Amino acid sequence: METDLARRLLASENYTCVIVSAEGVLTSRERGILPLMKWIGSGADLRGAVAADRIVGRAAALLYAYMGVSELYAEVLGEGGQKVLRDHGIAHGYGTLAVRIVNRSGTDICPMEKAVAQISDPAEAFSALREKMHEMGLLNA
């Protein structure tokens, strides 16, 4: 039921990601992992939540694992993200499976994917991604 709601909102409201939890529904139109970083930073309890997202690579998958979501649908799921979801027992579905997630200009691997390429621990990934986003000027304090 929650999965259907999350997918429906993602498709019909032009959101980039949607999370349905016991606390309610969180939505965002921000790009990349920024909304996930903000929700984690807010202290929201998202354990057991269901999520729908436009693009999920290794970085986003590690953040979803860190949040404790139980199920995820991605319109585009990177193979690295799929491995993380499997490793953390997160039920998932996708529209398209991509070999890799590239940067916005399509010229290289996404910098967030690079930041977590050798990381498998979600808490460590959160710290590395927070540092990378600060470095790039994408996240304030």
Predicted regions and their residues:
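Conserved mixed alpha/beta catalytic, RNA-binding, or beta-rich assembly cores of soluble enzyme
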Residues: 1-75, 97, 102-115
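C-terminal binding/interaction regions
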Residues: 67-70, 82-141
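Short, polar loop motifs at secondary-structure junctions
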Residues: 76-80
